Amino acid sequence: MLDLIATRRALHQIPELGMEEFKTHAFLMETIEGLLQDCSFAQVRTWKTGILVYLTGSAPEKTIGWRADIDGLPIVEETGLDFKSLHPDRMHACGHDFHMTIALGLLEKMAEQQPRNNLLFLFQPAEENLAGGMLMYEAGAFGDWLPDEFYGLHVRPDLKVGQMATNRATLFAGTCEVKIRFTGKGGHAAFPYTANDALVAASYFVTQVQSVVSRNVDPIEGAVVTFGSMHAGTTNNVIAETAFLHGTIRALTQNMSLLVQKRVREVAEGIALSFGVDLEIELNPSGYLPVENNPQLADELMTYFDGIDGVEMIDCPPAMTGEDFGYLLNKVPGVMFWLGVDTPYPLHNPRLSPKEEVLPFAVDKLSDFLKMKAN
């Protein structure tokens, strides 16, 4: 029987960045092979560092998918745990070690007896940085194993063990990375009329772009435009020839994201025209679309867990965090939900330490749900 605590701790010690999860891949493959050694209805495929495990049903009418992400973050761990990260400047600070462990536990349970419907377990790389779900889909990694329904979870620090949360609409925002460069003409600070100051243009842009959310976005729908980085100039007495800005757009629907992207571009173009500077702009939504739950499947999941002892199912509002599972849910109907892990530190914090007691709880409750779906 899989030791959930030991498995999680082993995975916690080897966090790796997206598409570099080589030790993680090897550990998962070894564990999966052990779990499936007596299973005659299982097949395994790999795609780079990703892994797909397919359980063939006895009389399949559909395929049910379960997804777990496997990558870590470029964070120096500060938990002080005996099993802290062995990789410098790398940490499982978003709970993906928990996601993998739960998926392995579910695989073990579901491989005990052949289900009626097919089951796919996806161990997906590069959630944090490269939208690995999109990469796998576009590369054809699923083939004829593409699920008819897809499910996935994310740990949530501010919920207690036993609490789960989701909704029947959008759970996470879609994100879009924004890169902007204004190019003017450098010169001596004493003679600004002989130059064209890119820093001034960029400063006006940062101010003007605030109107996009306040004047173009329905406040009931909501959106975020944040520029967290601006770099211009080299010293105090030289007028900046270039100014670079790096920001993010977040919205709860793809239509709203496209509207905000359009307005950010228009504001940047207007600033460039009015100041007579050149503009380069890159809007990159990549694979981080809004995580839009299928209403019927979400209602089924929420109703199911409402009737399960020991589970408190919460109907929660959406969050502006991003998740690349949104790309897969744009292709396949499904549901994502929060799983409470009761820790005072937020996701991506160097002290994040979820409660391990959630592991047997999650495997027990979620395996029953999967058995219901697969039979």
UniProtKB/Swiss-Prot annotation:
<keyword id="KW-0378">Hydrolase</keyword>
<dbReference type="InterPro" id="IPR002933">
    <property type="entry name" value="Peptidase_M20"/>
</dbReference>
<dbReference type="Pfam" id="PF01546">
    <property type="entry name" value="Peptidase_M20"/>
</dbReference>
<dbReference type="InterPro" id="IPR017439">
    <property type="entry name" value="Amidohydrolase"/>
</dbReference>
<feature type="active site" description="Proton acceptor">
    <location>
        <position position="128"/>
    </location>
</feature>
<keyword id="KW-0457">Lysine biosynthesis</keyword>
<comment type="similarity">
    <text>Belongs to the peptidase M20A family. N-acetyldiaminopimelate deacetylase subfamily.</text>
</comment>
<feature type="active site">
    <location>
        <position position="69"/>
    </location>
</feature>
<dbReference type="Pfam" id="PF07687">
    <property type="entry name" value="M20_dimer"/>
</dbReference>
<dbReference type="GO" id="GO:0009089">
    <property type="term" value="P:lysine biosynthetic process via diaminopimelate"/>
</dbReference>
<protein>
    <recommendedName>
        <fullName>N-acetyldiaminopimelate deacetylase</fullName>
        <ecNumber>3.5.1.47</ecNumber>
    </recommendedName>
</protein>
<dbReference type="GO" id="GO:0050118">
    <property type="term" value="F:N-acetyldiaminopimelate deacetylase activity"/>
</dbReference>
<dbReference type="GO" id="GO:0019877">
    <property type="term" value="P:diaminopimelate biosynthetic process"/>
</dbReference>
<keyword id="KW-0220">Diaminopimelate biosynthesis</keyword>
<dbReference type="InterPro" id="IPR023905">
    <property type="entry name" value="AcetylDAP_deacetylase"/>
</dbReference>
<dbReference type="InterPro" id="IPR036264">
    <property type="entry name" value="Bact_exopeptidase_dim_dom"/>
</dbReference>
<dbReference type="InterPro" id="IPR011650">
    <property type="entry name" value="Peptidase_M20_dimer"/>
</dbReference>
<keyword id="KW-0028">Amino-acid biosynthesis</keyword>
<comment type="function">
    <text>Catalyzes the conversion of N-acetyl-diaminopimelate to diaminopimelate and acetate.</text>
</comment>
<comment type="pathway">
    <text>Amino-acid biosynthesis; L-lysine biosynthesis via DAP pathway; LL-2,6-diaminopimelate from (S)-tetrahydrodipicolinate (acetylase route): step 3/3.</text>
</comment>
